[in-house]
Protein backbone atom coordinates (compact mmCIF):
# COMPACT_ATOMS: atom_id res chain seq x y z
CA UNK A 1 0.00 0.00 0.00
CA UNK A 2 1.35 3.41 -1.01
CA UNK A 3 0.95 6.11 1.62
CA UNK A 4 0.30 9.79 0.81
CA UNK A 5 3.89 10.47 1.84
CA UNK A 6 5.06 7.84 -0.62
CA UNK A 7 2.94 9.33 -3.41
CA UNK A 8 4.42 12.78 -2.71
CA UNK A 9 7.94 11.35 -2.77
CA UNK A 10 7.28 9.59 -6.09
CA UNK A 11 5.83 12.79 -7.55
CA UNK A 12 8.86 14.84 -6.50
CA UNK A 13 11.23 12.18 -7.85
CA UNK A 14 9.39 12.06 -11.19
CA UNK A 15 9.39 15.85 -11.47
CA UNK A 16 13.11 15.99 -10.69
CA UNK A 17 13.79 13.33 -13.30
CA UNK A 18 11.75 15.23 -15.90
CA UNK A 19 13.61 18.45 -15.06
CA UNK A 20 16.95 16.66 -15.43
CA UNK A 21 15.87 15.23 -18.78
CA UNK A 22 14.76 18.67 -19.96
CA UNK A 23 18.16 20.19 -19.18
CA UNK A 24 20.02 17.13 -20.42
CA UNK A 25 18.30 17.36 -23.80
CA UNK A 26 19.23 21.04 -24.21
CA UNK A 27 22.50 21.48 -26.05
CA UNK A 28 23.58 25.06 -25.53
CA UNK A 29 25.46 26.38 -28.58
CA UNK A 30 28.92 27.45 -27.43
CA UNK A 31 30.64 28.03 -30.76
CA UNK A 32 29.88 29.85 -33.99
CA UNK A 33 28.93 26.77 -36.01
CA UNK A 34 26.50 25.24 -33.51
CA UNK A 35 24.99 28.68 -32.85
CA UNK A 36 24.43 29.25 -36.57
CA UNK A 37 22.91 25.79 -36.99
CA UNK A 38 20.53 26.38 -34.06
CA UNK A 39 19.35 29.69 -35.52
CA UNK A 40 18.85 28.16 -38.95
CA UNK A 41 16.68 25.44 -37.42
CA UNK A 42 14.76 27.47 -34.82
CA UNK A 43 15.13 31.10 -35.90
CA UNK A 44 13.46 33.21 -38.61
CA UNK A 45 15.64 31.66 -41.32
CA UNK A 46 17.56 34.82 -42.24
CA UNK A 47 20.89 36.07 -40.87
CA UNK A 48 20.96 39.41 -39.07
CA UNK A 49 22.82 42.49 -40.32
CA UNK A 50 26.01 41.05 -38.73
CA UNK A 51 25.41 37.57 -40.13
CA UNK A 52 24.40 34.66 -37.91
CA UNK A 53 27.50 35.16 -35.76
CA UNK A 54 30.30 37.73 -35.88
CA UNK A 55 33.32 37.40 -33.59
CA UNK A 56 34.01 41.14 -33.83
CA UNK A 57 30.74 41.87 -32.03
CA UNK A 58 29.89 38.64 -30.17
CA UNK A 59 31.64 36.21 -27.83
CA UNK A 60 30.58 33.09 -25.95
CA UNK A 61 33.21 33.30 -23.17
CA UNK A 62 34.89 36.04 -21.18
CA UNK A 63 38.25 35.02 -22.65
CA UNK A 64 36.90 35.55 -26.18
CA UNK A 65 35.38 38.89 -25.16
CA UNK A 66 38.73 40.09 -23.83
CA UNK A 67 40.04 39.74 -27.39
CA UNK A 68 37.37 42.00 -28.87
CA UNK A 69 38.88 44.64 -31.17
CA UNK A 70 38.50 48.26 -30.12
CA UNK A 71 35.77 49.43 -32.49
CA UNK A 72 36.72 53.08 -32.01
CA UNK A 73 40.47 52.81 -32.60
CA UNK A 74 40.37 50.45 -35.59
CA UNK A 75 40.54 52.65 -38.68
CA UNK A 76 40.80 50.19 -41.56
CA UNK A 77 38.62 47.72 -43.46
CA UNK A 78 35.30 49.46 -43.06
CA UNK A 79 31.94 48.57 -44.58
CA UNK A 80 28.42 50.01 -44.56
CA UNK A 81 25.39 48.54 -42.78
CA UNK A 82 21.95 49.80 -41.95
CA UNK A 83 21.21 50.65 -38.33
CA UNK A 84 17.84 50.34 -36.64
CA UNK A 85 17.37 53.86 -35.27
CA UNK A 86 19.70 55.87 -37.50
CA UNK A 87 18.58 59.08 -39.18
CA UNK A 88 21.42 58.63 -41.69
CA UNK A 89 21.01 55.98 -44.45
CA UNK A 90 24.33 54.26 -43.81
CA UNK A 91 26.74 54.05 -40.89
CA UNK A 92 30.36 53.01 -41.07
CA UNK A 93 31.33 50.06 -38.89
CA UNK A 94 34.13 47.51 -38.89
CA UNK A 95 34.33 44.93 -41.68
CA UNK A 96 33.14 41.39 -41.07
CA UNK A 97 29.45 42.12 -41.32
CA UNK A 98 26.79 41.28 -43.86
CA UNK A 99 24.49 44.00 -45.10
CA UNK A 100 20.84 42.91 -45.03
CA UNK A 101 18.97 42.73 -48.33
CA UNK A 102 15.75 44.03 -46.83
CA UNK A 103 16.48 45.92 -43.62
CA UNK A 104 12.96 47.23 -43.12
CA UNK A 105 11.44 43.74 -43.36
CA UNK A 106 14.05 42.24 -41.01
CA UNK A 107 13.64 45.00 -38.43
CA UNK A 108 9.84 44.63 -38.51
CA UNK A 109 10.17 40.90 -37.82
CA UNK A 110 12.77 41.33 -35.08
CA UNK A 111 10.87 44.05 -33.23
CA UNK A 112 8.01 41.59 -32.63
CA UNK A 113 10.32 39.78 -30.20
CA UNK A 114 11.37 41.42 -26.95
CA UNK A 115 14.80 43.03 -26.84
CA UNK A 116 16.92 42.14 -23.82
CA UNK A 117 18.06 45.08 -21.72
CA UNK A 118 21.75 45.57 -21.03
CA UNK A 119 23.02 43.73 -17.97
CA UNK A 120 26.52 45.05 -17.28
CA UNK A 121 28.31 47.42 -19.66
CA UNK A 122 31.89 48.57 -19.08
CA UNK A 123 34.00 50.97 -21.12
CA UNK A 124 36.82 49.01 -22.74
CA UNK A 125 39.02 51.77 -24.16
CA UNK A 126 39.58 55.48 -24.67
CA UNK A 127 36.80 57.64 -26.06
CA UNK A 128 37.46 59.60 -29.24
CA UNK A 129 35.88 62.15 -31.56
CA UNK A 130 37.32 60.41 -34.63
CA UNK A 131 36.56 56.98 -36.06
CA UNK A 132 37.82 55.57 -39.31
CA UNK A 133 39.92 58.71 -39.68
CA UNK A 134 36.77 60.83 -39.84
CA UNK A 135 35.89 63.64 -37.43
CA UNK A 136 32.71 62.93 -35.48
CA UNK A 137 30.20 65.38 -34.07
CA UNK A 138 29.83 63.20 -30.96
CA UNK A 139 32.47 61.56 -28.80
CA UNK A 140 32.31 57.77 -29.04
CA UNK A 141 33.52 55.10 -26.60
CA UNK A 142 34.25 51.37 -27.00
CA UNK A 143 32.39 49.15 -24.54
CA UNK A 144 31.83 45.52 -23.64
CA UNK A 145 28.49 44.24 -22.35
CA UNK A 146 27.94 41.07 -20.31
CA UNK A 147 24.38 39.91 -20.98
CA UNK A 148 24.46 37.29 -18.23
CA UNK A 149 24.70 33.49 -18.02
CA UNK A 150 21.21 32.85 -19.47
CA UNK A 151 22.11 34.48 -22.80
CA UNK A 152 24.19 33.08 -25.65
CA UNK A 153 26.39 34.55 -26.96
CA UNK A 154 26.91 36.12 -23.56
CA UNK A 155 29.14 39.07 -24.50
CA UNK A 156 28.76 41.82 -27.10
CA UNK A 157 31.19 44.48 -28.35
CA UNK A 158 29.64 47.93 -28.69
CA UNK A 159 30.23 51.60 -29.47
CA UNK A 160 28.50 54.10 -27.16
CA UNK A 161 28.04 57.84 -26.90
CA UNK A 162 30.32 59.32 -24.25
CA UNK A 163 27.47 61.61 -23.17
CA UNK A 164 24.08 60.47 -24.53
CA UNK A 165 21.82 63.42 -25.30
CA UNK A 166 24.72 65.89 -25.56
CA UNK A 167 24.04 68.87 -27.83
CA UNK A 168 25.69 68.64 -31.25
CA UNK A 169 25.11 69.99 -34.74
CA UNK A 170 26.45 71.79 -37.79
CA UNK A 171 26.18 75.55 -38.10
CA UNK A 172 22.70 76.68 -37.14
CA UNK A 173 21.32 73.13 -37.23
CA UNK A 174 21.31 71.59 -33.76
CA UNK A 175 20.93 68.00 -32.64
CA UNK A 176 21.52 65.44 -29.91
CA UNK A 177 24.08 62.64 -29.62
CA UNK A 178 22.42 59.23 -29.55
CA UNK A 179 23.32 55.60 -30.11
CA UNK A 180 22.39 53.76 -33.31
CA UNK A 181 21.85 50.01 -33.14
CA UNK A 182 21.48 46.79 -35.04
CA UNK A 183 19.38 43.85 -33.86
CA UNK A 184 20.65 40.26 -33.89
CA UNK A 185 18.99 36.95 -33.08
CA UNK A 186 20.41 35.60 -29.80
CA UNK A 187 19.35 32.74 -27.52
CA UNK A 188 18.13 32.78 -23.92
CA UNK A 189 16.52 30.39 -21.47
CA UNK A 190 12.78 30.83 -21.25
CA UNK A 191 11.65 31.55 -17.69
CA UNK A 192 8.47 29.54 -18.20
CA UNK A 193 9.74 26.18 -19.46
CA UNK A 194 13.57 26.35 -19.17
CA UNK A 195 13.96 25.90 -22.93
CA UNK A 196 16.15 27.92 -25.25
CA UNK A 197 14.29 30.56 -27.23
CA UNK A 198 15.32 32.97 -29.97
CA UNK A 199 14.99 36.67 -29.18
CA UNK A 200 16.19 39.96 -30.69
CA UNK A 201 19.26 41.49 -29.02
CA UNK A 202 20.16 45.14 -29.54
CA UNK A 203 23.83 45.91 -30.25
CA UNK A 204 24.85 49.56 -30.21
CA UNK A 205 27.29 50.09 -33.08
CA UNK A 206 27.83 53.85 -33.27
CA UNK A 207 26.99 57.24 -31.81
CA UNK A 208 25.46 59.75 -34.20
CA UNK A 209 24.37 63.35 -34.06
CA UNK A 210 20.63 63.24 -34.69
CA UNK A 211 19.85 66.60 -36.26
CA UNK A 212 16.62 68.42 -35.48
CA UNK A 213 15.39 69.34 -38.95
CA UNK A 214 12.62 71.93 -39.08
Curated annotation (Swiss-Prot):
Residue numbers spanned by region Disordered: 99-121
UniProt organism field: Acropora millepora
Principal cellular location given in the protein's record: secreted
Tissue specificity annotation: Component of the acid-insoluble and acid-soluble organic matrix of the aragonitic skeleton (at protein level).
Keywords: Secreted, Signal
Signal peptide limits: 1-24
Polar residues bias (residue ranges): 100-109
Gene Ontology CC, one term: extracellular region
SUPFAM superfamilies from the UniProt entry: Cystine-knot cytokines
Entry's localization field: Secreted
Annotated protein name in UniProt: Uncharacterized skeletal organic matrix protein 8
Amino acid sequence: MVTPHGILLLTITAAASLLWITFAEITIPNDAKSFENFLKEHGPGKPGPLGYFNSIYMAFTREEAENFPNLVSVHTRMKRIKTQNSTIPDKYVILGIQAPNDTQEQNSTRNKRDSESYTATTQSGTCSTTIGGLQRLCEVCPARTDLGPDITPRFINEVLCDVPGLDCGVGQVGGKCRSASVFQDFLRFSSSDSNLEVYSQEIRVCCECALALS
